């Protein structure tokens, strides 16, 4: 075993035992904040510690079985027993490796989905609308809530741009692989000669930060403009300056919100999106430290990232990042997105495991 890994596991076990004692002490029980923090840490490391203890027991079992080989009568039994225990040990090693992988703290958070029509005119906007419906149906499968934060509709259907908030545990962890370019190939309804057109949309996934950890944005760094809404809102449309445009001067990020009748609500939505964008920019910089494969899988939400091609004529979706092709386009558009997300997550995990290549228990 890699000595640094072994020492880490021993250290975790010692800490686990230490917390166990502390949780039973009166001064800890009487201090709610301390008790809460220790309980959380205890829960976080308990699974890996329990599996490490099992591994140590299997190591001891193997040593004891090897002693049986000195007895001729026990040789066959020992050989059979050794095979079983080694198999158990190997399976446990793989589990421990996965448990040792760093956990992205944003994976359990909610997220914003930003979909923009890129090349292809009306067809691109229509496809943006279909992508939004796909993500909405996918969210329903996990009982996540979807709320439109900002949208710009296209006259012929779909959206030029739409930003939605997906609220639910684990939303960001599963949807983060959607960032990048999405390409559609099909014959548009307006095409009289039956020619296949190619259009593109970009998707960006931004984690929603907890209120206690939201990016601090200085008011002095913001330029806030109000204007009359041109979207939904009934009789109040174009009668009050309820729409908001906020520019974050240092980064150049601009967010517009006009879906609500209330200027205050539009401002609150715009600020929450802006906070997520500023944080997403920081994440993008930190991802440069990731391996090239992980950067490809996560994407950046830029047009240059080519995630998938959706070919309607062939009922085909190809994910170019892992060379995966499935002929279930209709099912995916109905929300069965795990057909694509699960293989991506497995590839991502495999790449992270490769960084633990020296870890041989």
UniProtKB/Swiss-Prot annotation:
It comes from the Bacteria. Transmembrane segments: none annotated. Methylated by PrmC. Methylation increases the termination efficiency of RF1. InterPro entries: PCRF, Pep_chain_release_fac_I, Pep_chain_release_fac_I_sf, Prokaryotic/Mito_RF, RF-1. One of its GO terms (molecular function) is translation release factor activity, codon specific. The modification N5-methylglutamine is found at residue 235. Belongs to the prokaryotic/mitochondrial release factor family. Peptide chain release factor 1 directs the termination of translation in response to the peptide chain termination codons UAG and UAA. This is Peptide chain release factor 1. The gene is prfA.
């Amino acid at each position: 075993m890699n000595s640094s890994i072994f020492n880490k596991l021993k250290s975790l076990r010692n800490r686990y035992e230490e917390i166990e004692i502390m949780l039973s002490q009166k001064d800890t029980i009487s201090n709610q904040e301390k008790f809460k923090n220790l309980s959380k840490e205890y829960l976080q490391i308990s699974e890996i510690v329990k599996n490490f203890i099992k591994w140590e027991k299997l190591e001891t079992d193997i040593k004891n079985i090897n002693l049986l080989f000195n007895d001729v009568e026990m040789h066959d039994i020992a050989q059979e027993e050794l095979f079983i225990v080694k198999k158990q040990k190997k399976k446990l090693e793989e589990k421990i490796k996965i448990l040792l992988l760093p956990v992205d703290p944003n994976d359990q958070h909610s997220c914003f989905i930003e979909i923009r029509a890129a090349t292809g005119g009306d067809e691109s906007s229509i496809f943006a609308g279909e992508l939004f419906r796909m993500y909405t149906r996918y969210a329903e499968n996990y009982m996540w809530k979807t709320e439109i934060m900002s949208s710009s509709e296209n006259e012929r259907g779909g959206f030029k741009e739409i930003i939605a908030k997906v609220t639910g545990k684990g939303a960001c962890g599963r949807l983060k692989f959607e960032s990048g370019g999405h390409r559609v190939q099909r014959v548009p309804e307006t095409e009289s000669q039956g020619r296949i057109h190619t259009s593109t949309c970009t998707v960006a996934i931004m984690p929603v930060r907890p209120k206690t950890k939201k990016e601090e944005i200085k008011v002095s760094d913001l330029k806030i403009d109000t204007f009359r809404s041109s979207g939904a809102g009934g009789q109040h449309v174009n009668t009050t300056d309820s729409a908001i445009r906020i520019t974050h001067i240092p980064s150049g990020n601009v967010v517009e919100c006009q879906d609500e009748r209330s200027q205050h609500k539009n401002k609150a939505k715009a600020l929450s999106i802006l906070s997520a964008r500023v944080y997403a920019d920081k994440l993008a910089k930190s991802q440069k430290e990731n391996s090239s494969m992980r950067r490809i899988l996560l994407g950046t939400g830029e047009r240059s990232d080519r995630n998938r091609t959706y070919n309607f004529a062939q009922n085909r979706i190809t994910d170019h990042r892992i060379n995966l092709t499935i002929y279930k386009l209709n099912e995916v558009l109905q929300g069965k997105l795990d057909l694509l997300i699960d293989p991506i997550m497995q590839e991502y995990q495999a790449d992270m495991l490769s960084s633990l290549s020296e870890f041989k228990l």
